[in-house]
Amino acid sequence: MNNVLRGEYVENMVAALLAPHWVQPWKSNHEWSLWDLERKRGGRTEKLEIKQSARMQPWGPVRSPPRFDIAPKRDFNRLDEPPCRRADAYVFAWHAEVGDAADHRDPAQWVFFVAATRSLPPDQKTVSLGWLRRNATQVGFDQLPAVLDAALTQMTRRR
């Protein structure tokens, strides 16, 4: 599965797990969306970014350590505003399987990391898998909804 298709697949896999409360905010042009999923809760809209990486690529296994994009984004409808991270939280998905057993479609083969946006390094454009293992909450697919809810609830209480 190529990177673009895998990214869309993982976004939709997570969206299906978090439905019906979380929805995709875009109607037809999701490439321009500033976040991947959103939900209304407590009078506000919570926004979620989903990032993914996999060791197995179409050309074979990658040996370099994975990095996940967290760069601030510009809202092209408001070019006068500086770029920023628009989501409240990030879900990072890592697929480490290689060889014939690797199946990007299998949620059980993915490891997920949940991080509040404000916990991300403010001056970095990417984070490594090592950083996520040290600083984010690692979960399996089935635990993702509960851990994400807990992280966002804790974040809301700190405001």
Q: Model-predicted segments: where are they?
A:
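Nucleic-acid endonuclease domains
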Residues: 1-46, 51-159
